[in-house]
């Protein structure tokens, strides 16, 4: 059955076939019989990787990507648990570069974060990464320098287990989801700083107002619009960067390129999903197939059968499916419903299955943001929040690509000051029976914090915005349970609470209202077990990643649930996890939305004796 797609999407698909060999530096990618490029695979213990520019044509316009070994994505690396791997990374760019091995436990000087782990790889230079592989599962790797991840410096990573895995399968495919823009990422960032909702082409219309009046009444609808206007936010702004500029790729291919993964009817097929995008959350389903989730972030979980799952930026999920028909669509729609990545599982090349329409666009509500129970008619005071010009912008070298030089996290730019007394207009008496969330003093009177969650909750059993009550079984964090008990076993000796903060209009992001350059490192004592509590004081969803150590997610009662390397934090959520400080050194800790990290949602963690 043929799918329906727009002409624009079709052109993108055809244009993606024009990926070139590139500047004499690269071999041409291999192509399957259908015209779909195959992932290059490198395995063993010795690897040579080269990062350089590569001309591409994904949307009908010629652009320059940065690529690893001439591929977009880079080669699939296959390691074996227990081996020592050596990776020689050569920089053929005109700028410094780096490779970070996401979720991999290794020495700090092998972690690949310029300014913390090492100095970076200068143009023409070579850096040799060497470390023992201590884990197994599905991971990925990417640049931690500037915006290089956005323009192609990333690739998938699979580590074969030393011991038998707790499930059986017959064959497998790696499915890496990414987002591509023809814009210069520096220009894109400038645009967000000038107008943070520039890429939101789905603002509410007069027609929406009329419909809301019919559903909710005049007074409630006017109060709702007034409240959002005073907060200088938009309930349709689920993603800072949308399909207005992004083309969503599956294994480097636009939707109409029809990436195809072959299977034999009746076999058990393992799919290793990786979200390697810069900014995009994806909701994944395969119409006609149940997915049995068996691993999250490379770690085995008790099997759970679902129809759909949301994958945060930087997360990985392994699922097993048992296809019997000739063809199925792998459908990954963006969380804001502005586009999708798509591929096909089929018994032979050239087949397609029906592509479902995008789901309705969700809206963020006050309840979503942890504001449940507020008298929203009394929020006039929120208009007092300082939404003036961002003085810190001038420190970013006019966004000339070196706002965080090569992501040198010892030199990130500054923003300071806050005005937060404006929350006085809220009717806190309307929140009787709720536990009011406290907030750090650094958020008060801070012009770079535009909201605070009043009653955040863990939301572990919440499918998320746009996925509730959709008639499908959707994976939640409450469904995830590691196949092992808490590997440490100790109760945390202390708790560290951090708030995810930001200002939508100014496109400013931070922890506790303090940008990275103004923040002191978080100090952990070597060997201690700590509990980290995160509170999301923004209307955005943030994937939070700690380098070098595992994040052991807890339930609301403080019981160990699942081991992760990236913790998804929806709006209005409060989640806790345990960390064993077993890795001496300096480590990055940040939001994995690239432009949020670039704008300051980043901290250094130091593990000291």
Curated annotation (Swiss-Prot):
Subcellular location(s) of the protein: Periplasm
Region (5 X 8 AA tandem repeats of D-H-X-X-M-X-G-M): 367-434
Main subcellular location of this protein, as a coarse class: periplasm
Key words of the record: Copper, Metal-binding, Oxidoreductase, Periplasm, Plasmid, Repeat, Signal
Region forming the signal peptide: 1-32
Post-translational modification note: Predicted to be exported by the Tat system. The position of the signal peptide cleavage has been experimentally proven.
Gene Ontology molecular function terms on file: copper ion binding; oxidoreductase activity
Superkingdom of origin: Bacteria
Positions of Sequence repeats: 367-374, 375-382, 408-415, 419-426, 427-434
Transmembrane segments: none
A Pfam family the protein falls into: Cu-oxidase
Ligand binding (Cu cation 1): 100, 545
Residues annotated for Cu cation 4 binding in this entry: 542, 591, 596, 601
Function: Mediates copper resistance by sequestration of copper in the periplasm along with the copper-binding protein CopC. May have oxidase activity.
Similarity field: Belongs to the multicopper oxidase family. CopA subfamily.
Name of this chain's protein: Copper resistance protein A
Species this chain originates from: Pseudomonas syringae pv. tomato
Gene field: copA
